[in-house]
Amino acid sequence: MDSSQNNKCETIDWSVGDASLDGPALVAAIGNFDGVHRGHAQVISAAIDTARAQGLASAVVTFDPHPREFFRQDDAPFHLADRQEKDRLIAALGVDRIIHVRFDDNLRCTDAESFVTSVLPALGVKALFAGADFAFGRGRGGDIDTINTIGAGIGISATAVTLLADPNSAVITSSRVRAALQDGEPERAAEMLGHDWTVTGTVQMGDQRGRTI
């Protein structure tokens, strides 16, 4: 388990089998949150607002690598934001803690019941917010109702946040943002993201042929 702190938002890496995290009880938003688009922001803001109303700390629980990258290593979709940018966008919403849960074979094999009774308590989560289509656990066998049913006996609850749609009633998703970018429509992508899409990278020294022209 590793942790760092930036602008009062603590960032933690955690894997199945690690010790339980120290700290206060959390109201958390959970998801992959690639690109942190407007729909993601709605889920995260719901968790933050509830945490503040109850005097608790807020968190975002996300997965690293993206599950699709784990299962489709040869043809995984491109990331809308690298980890640094993703953390920056999430922190800007005002969350107290970002927890990156490692998506590995241990997590893949964790069934829905164990996720609720073991993983969420280890992270300190007491209340969870997720998109209405959220599924988790081995074979995606769990959903919001699963958390509420199993979590009732251990003090964990979950709330489904209605998926955000655009003016044409189409749900905003990371896949739609990627499609807009691939179609050469950055303005449409930015409307769904709620911010401009940026690319970061390292500048490499070239052959310096330009100075000979």
PLM region descriptions:
Residues V60, H100, A160-V161:
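A structural preference for short, hydrophobic beta-strand core positions in alpha/beta folds
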Residues Q54-L56, V95, I156, H195:
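Short glycine/serine/threonine/alanine-rich loop segments
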